[in-house]
């Protein structure tokens, strides 16, 4: 869609979708939500369907590696988190957003978008006043704290979103398959009814012809 040289990247968009289809609107809903993100974004796709979608649309990708949602590990999430926070710290993008499917129940799953970075931590007026009165010098520096803690936070958020997305995919697929099974059963019932009607009509026609022939 555009190169780094053409425009600055405003955000990194982590998009979690499924590895397979036959899950109702699960993949379509989260990909549609991600497509609504405005600005020049770089995409980190997780899930085969997510990778295929953004490759087809020639999006700027954070990595060329195809990460399967069902197989991604905690260790891989920590590795991604370190790369993400390092890119954010260097100013390669201004924000990190996460699009995934929140698991509400077996019947309900919702595609959502959340902002992971920057952290929204607005202090209260009391905290501001206490900070002004305080003469305490905190160590280590905020830079060291960011390097140590934020990657763990990002990894936890990403892995939690992956787990919810996988659970949502399984629930959506089960619902879709239940609906397909029910529809197939109803279709079989209708076809049996049509078959029995046609068979009965043929038998009635044969009896009518036999009776008519006997009367002659």
Regions found by a protein language model. Give the residues of each.
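C-terminal beta-strand-loop-alpha-helix "lid" module of Rossmann-like NAD(P)-dependent dehydrogenases
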Residues: 1-216
């Amino acid at each position: 869609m555009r190169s780094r040289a053409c425009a600055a990247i405003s955000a990194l968009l982590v998009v979690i979708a499924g590895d397979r289809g036959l899950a109702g609107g699960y993949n379509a809903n989260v990909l549609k939500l991600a497509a609504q993100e405005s600005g020049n974004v770089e995409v980190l796709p997780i899930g085969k369907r997510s990778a295929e979608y953004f490759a087809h649309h020639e999006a700027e990708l954070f990595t060329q590696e195809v990460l399967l949602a069902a197989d991604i590990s905690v260790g891989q999430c920590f590795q991604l988190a370190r790369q993400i926070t390092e890119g954010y710290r260097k100013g390669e993008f201004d924000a990190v957003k996460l699009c995934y499917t929140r698991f509400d129940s077996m019947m309900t799953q919702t595609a959502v978008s959340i902002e992971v970075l920057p952290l929204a931590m607005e202090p209260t007026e009391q905290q501001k006043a206490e900070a002004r009165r305080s003469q305490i010098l905190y160590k280590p520096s905020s830079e060291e704290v960011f390097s140590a803690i934020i990657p763990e936070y990002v990894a936890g958020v990403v892995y939690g979103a992956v787990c919810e997305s996988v659970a949502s995919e399984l629930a959506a697929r089960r619902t879709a398959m239940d609906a397909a099974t029910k529809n197939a059963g109803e279709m079989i019932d209708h076809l049996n009814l049509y078959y029995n009607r046609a068979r009965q009509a043929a038998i009635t026609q044969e009896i009518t012809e036999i009776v008519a022939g006997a009367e002659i």
